[in-house]
């Protein structure tokens, strides 16, 4: 009987340690802040825009986000400048689970294949910004 009791205590201790470790891992994952890719895109009069290529970019860019569970939060909406100089083009904001996924998307083969379309017809400033965790 003593052996069974010791075995039961050992199993319970192992389960408790496993649960504590799982909770610690989950807490660490929950604290990873989201990330946002922010793009300021301006038509460049010195570059020749190819309408067919621009349509391809508009179709393929959203598809390239799917593998990274990302989504557009802002995609060229109306801008009201509250302070400072107004952007000359439009703004795009894309939400990601974390910075690693945002960078993974930007350097992914799917986005690398279409990135030159945007680069050849616009001036862009692309940033990745770490957000804050839910509080």
Where are these regions (language model features)?
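Intrinsically disordered, low-complexity sequence elements enriched in Ser/Thr/Gly/Pro
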Residues: 3-4, 73, 116, 123
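Generic serine detector
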Residues: 16, 54, 64, 108, ...
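Surface-exposed, polar helix/loop patches in the mature regions of secreted/periplasmic/lumenal proteins
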Residues: 91-135
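Bacterial N-terminal signal peptides that target proteins for export
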Residues: 1-11
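Bacterial N-terminal signal peptides
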Residues: 10-20
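Short S/T/G/P-rich N-terminal loop/turn motif that feeds into the first structured element of a domain
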Residues: 5, 18-90, 97-101, 131-135
């Amino acid at each position: 009987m003593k052996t069974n009791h010791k075995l039961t205590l050992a199993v319970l201790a192992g389960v408790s340690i496993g649960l504590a470790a799982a909770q610690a891992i989950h807490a660490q994952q929950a604290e990873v802040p989201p990330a946002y890719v922010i793009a300021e895109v301006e038509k460049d009069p010195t570059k020749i825009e190819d309408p067919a290529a621009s349509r391809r970019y508009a179709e393929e860019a959203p598809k390239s986000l799917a593998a990274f569970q990302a989504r557009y939060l802002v995609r060229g909406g109306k801008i009201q400048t509250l302070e400072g100089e107004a952007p000359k083009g439009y703004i795009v904001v894309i939400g990601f689970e974390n910075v690693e996924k945002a960078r993974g998307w930007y350097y992914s083969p799917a986005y690398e294949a279409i990135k030159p379309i945007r680069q050849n017809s616009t001036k862009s400033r692309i940033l990745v910004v770490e957000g804050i965790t839910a509080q």
